[in-house]
């Protein structure tokens, strides 16, 4: 079955071979979808016939957002920590263990309901591809439970057993557990492995050991680094074949050179800095150096509890030195690059049919009018979603 989506006032394709700029913008456009894939893109007047039609009434249409960094499987509410930070308390990474305790106690059905609620929020915000991390179990049983829940919702599941050291373990003992029994147990459910390399979590040697174990298990590599301070691990980790380094607030020139030389994506997470009152990363410095940049939510219960890419777009252009064009690209095609995907974050023949129409004449309004619900319709894999108001419950 095919459908032609026509009368698109302004279409962003992220395909520079069409349109007039890097965003591949086309005015008065149409898109033909066959099944879950895009079959044709071009001017409305030239659109081929299809079985069905959908009239966008002149709306602006963009690719679905690609959120390449999120932590949506957990239990428990940490709003009190946000309140403490807003009252002057300094952010440290210790709150993760509060979520671990609640998550270990939660049944799988409850965790699935939490993730479903967050994904519904994301869909209402225009997100159609989500990377989801484990990391709130820190024992074999719970990490497997989190991986199973996440894998029932997305193909982009990341094993983050190396979030912090489990409270019942010594650091070296826990690294052995992560690299051995835990990794083996979660392997059927995950595509990626990630490590939180920061003071209070894992040091560079431990980080490299865990990443190498992930490589041996056939997983793609991701890294949290340079969020709380400079990191020594990034150049060495990039040589292992990282897909992305995430946070990237405190990067050295050597770090940026390594990202560029290895084609590693720098994923920026402005909602984390917004919530923790930490300095924002300098996105312009990365773009000027030719590094590929992604923009994601870091949706998590402690330091960035937002599911909204549009919110992150607004922060990125105001606080991080991104142009609006760079921000939109980073939240779509950039996120796809961070996941080594070429079938999402773009509107072109062969790509998955993920489209978002806006209740605005231009995508610029996503940043120009922050906080306004401008997402009108969302098409994911060729199906228009029903955007019900999600009901998120964090405590059983």
Curated annotation (Swiss-Prot):
Function comment: Catalyzes the hydrolytic cleavage of the carbon-nitrogen bond in imidazolone-5-propanoate to yield N-formimidoyl-L-glutamate. It is the third step in the universal histidine degradation pathway.
Organism field: Cutibacterium acnes (strain DSM 16379 / KPA171202)
Q: Which GO terms describe its biological process?
A: L-histidine catabolic process to glutamate and formamide; L-histidine catabolic process to glutamate and formate
Write down the required cofactor(s).
Zn(2+); Fe(3+)
Q: Name one GO molecular function term.
A: zinc ion binding
Keywords attached to this Swiss-Prot or TrEMBL record, sorted alphabetically, are: Cytoplasm, Histidine metabolism, Hydrolase, Iron, Metal-binding, Zinc
* Residues reported to bind Fe(3+): 69, 71, 224, 298
Looking at the UniProt entry, the stretches that span the membrane are: none
Q: What is its EC number?
A: 3.5.2.7
Record protein name field: Imidazolonepropionase
Top enzyme category: hydrolase
Location, primary (coarse class): cytoplasm
Q: Does the keyword Hydrolase apply?
A: yes
For Zn(2+), which residues are the binding ones?
A: 69, 71, 224, 298
Question: What are the binding positions for 4-imidazolone-5-propanoate in this chain?
Answer: 78, 136, 163, 227, 303
Q: Which domain of life is it from?
A: Bacteria
